[in-house]
Amino acid sequence: MASEIFGIAAVFWVLIPVGLAGGALLLKLQKD
């Protein structure tokens, strides 16, 4: 069960920065 929690945490650790970077990129593209 602990492995499942660590797996979910790892997914969030990856998705959150990627989502923020993707959102920033979209904003930059829309401004140009």
Swiss-Prot record:
Key words, A-Z: Electron transport, Membrane, Photosynthesis, Thylakoid, Transmembrane, Transmembrane helix, Transport
Protein name: Cytochrome b6-f complex subunit 7
Keyword field contains Transport: yes
Membrane topology: Single-pass membrane protein
Subunit structure: The 4 large subunits of the cytochrome b6-f complex are cytochrome b6, subunit IV (17 kDa polypeptide, PetD), cytochrome f and the Rieske protein, while the 4 small subunits are PetG, PetL, PetM and PetN. The complex functions as a dimer.
Compartments, record wording: Cellular thylakoid membrane
InterPro entries: PetM_cyt_b6/f_cplx_su7
Role summary: Component of the cytochrome b6-f complex, which mediates electron transfer between photosystem II (PSII) and photosystem I (PSI), cyclic electron flow around PSI, and state transitions.
Superkingdom of this protein's organism: Bacteria
A GO BP annotation: photosynthesis
GO cellular component, one term: cytochrome b6f complex
Family: Belongs to the PetM family.
Listed transmembrane segments: 9-27
One Pfam family recorded for the sequence: PetM
Keyword Ribonucleoprotein: no
Gene: petM
